[in-house]
């Protein structure tokens, strides 16, 4: 494992982002980036020296863009934009998301389209490397003109203002700068705007959600396979020939996952020739459902891969031609739509899992004891655990409502159509919490269902999952305090302990 990575601006992959964050690597900017960064900054300096009027350099902002600012006030202008825009509210974003925001902002500014000094980029790198994380409230951005409010909070510590977190402790920005070997910066022309303009918060929130959603996808394949066995379901619907006729590669891949997980199940062989003709859709149609989920996640990944390297500042500096152009790359519509698609996928993961829990606890379908407990009546078993799953699934349906169709004009109608990308991405994390809860309950219910098939065993692959669950949660022979069991399995899920890759590598 390397302790640092060389950042080639504009060349981050999703895999490299995961590796950088998971391994806590520090960042070293490739020297090849220095020339363009410096040329871009000199292009801005030339505008000032030639007394030209260019938006963002020597004008007001938003609907105040027509007001020209004198040269002796330009530094104050850049400081003011950071201070005035730092008006967020809500819970602070977690450190792992802030680390990703810093990485994306460094990657953005280092490509040489923003006109900032190398010194400013190096200051952001120092914060990232020393794990000094600015305190960023979660609410305040509408996803155009970029993530202005949260990025203002990201920028405050560079001025010696606000607070930061380091090793979980809240400290002053001044203390944080010292830890990173920095002193407060005096921003030069365009630098405040360059820090604030951009979609790094929306992108980081969406990327973080995507990475966790990949884990939930794998867990859902596993828990769904366990439910098939616990409910004495059939593996025939996972036959490759069926899925080849449909032609969707994601569905074909999902079906293969179910086949591999269920292969060798003694439980399946014991009822292969029973009278049940077909299983309910939540069992039988899992490849079709989860294939569609996988397809959406792949689309979201492709979109965010581009956005992680995208330039979303305004105006943009094209140093080679000496041009500074105003456009709208700060508009986060594509991130909002990607987040909406991921929300649909998360809702379907949780919704289908909730239906399988309902099947397992229904003795008339599953043939298992009512609510998966002996002496039902005296014991309620999984009756109310299913209610919790239903509550979370229903919550997800409301949260899945598209945010990209919403817009409210801001800045005196200068910014008259906004994307809501930040809220679209932020709500994914609430959906992740709901979905991981549902999957934890399904894993518990399916493993409890397996108890009633003994001495028959599930497949070798699924037995590893069963043993992992039982290592922290014993079987239910009577009612007990249920919530801690859900939390134990939920933690295992989010710690990536129920992974298809893990099973393959064992």
From Swiss-Prot:
The EC number on file is 4.3.1.3
Record localization: Cytoplasm
Does the keyword field hold Transcription regulation?
no
Annotated crosslink 5-imidazolinone (Ala-Gly) location: 144-146
The protein's matches in CDD domains, at most eight in alphabetical order, are given as: PAL-HAL
What pathway is it annotated to?
Amino-acid degradation; L-histidine degradation into L-glutamate; N-formimidoyl-L-glutamate from L-histidine: step 1/3
Gene Ontology cellular-component terms for this entry are: cytoplasm
Q: Which reaction does it catalyse?
A: L-histidine = trans-urocanate + NH4(+)
- Alphabetized NCBIfam families for the sequence: hutH, PRK09367.1
Which Gene Ontology molecular function entries are recorded, alphabetically? histidine ammonia-lyase activity
Q: How is it modified after translation?
A: Contains an active site 4-methylidene-imidazol-5-one (MIO), which is formed autocatalytically by cyclization and dehydration of residues Ala-Ser-Gly.
Full protein name: Histidine ammonia-lyase
Span of the signal peptide = none
